[in-house]
């Protein structure tokens, strides 16, 4: 089954997450089909905190992709900030 979820990157004590489309059986940080955006929970200064490609997320969802709870909340947050 296809999953749209977070994949952790960054260094110790400074996480950085990529939003990826991947097979749900794959390990969290292993191979992915497509990178759909990123989330930087500890953005500093001018660093961007969140960027998502909503068109591609909708495409993968139409192909049967299951969106994780955390990614759903990030999409909601992204849409809210885009309306400002």
Curated annotation (Swiss-Prot):
One function term, GO molecular function aspect: structural constituent of ribosome
InterPro entries: Ribosomal_bS16 (IPR000307), Ribosomal_bS16_dom_sf (IPR023803)
Name of a matching Pfam family: Ribosomal_S16
Keyword terms: Ribonucleoprotein, Ribosomal protein
Source organism superkingdom: Bacteria
An example Gene Ontology biological process: translation
GO cellular component: cytoplasm; small ribosomal subunit
Family that this chain belongs to: Belongs to the bacterial ribosomal protein bS16 family.
Record-linked NCBIfam families: S16 (TIGR00002)
Name of the protein this chain belongs to: Small ribosomal subunit protein bS16
Species in which this protein is naturally found: Dichelobacter nodosus (strain VCS1703A)
Gene that produces this protein: rpsP
């Amino acid at each position: 089954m296809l999953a749209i979820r977070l994949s952790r990157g960054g260094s110790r004590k400074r996480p950085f997450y990529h939003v990826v489309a991947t097979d749900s059986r794959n390990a969290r940080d292993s191979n992915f089909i497509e990178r759909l955006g990123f989330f930087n929970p500890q953005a500093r200064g001018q660093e961007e905190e969140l960027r998502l490609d909503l068109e591609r997320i909708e495409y993968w969802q139409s192909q049967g992709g299951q969106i994780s709870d955390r990614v759903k909340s990030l999409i909601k947050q992204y849409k809210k900030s885009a309306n400002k």
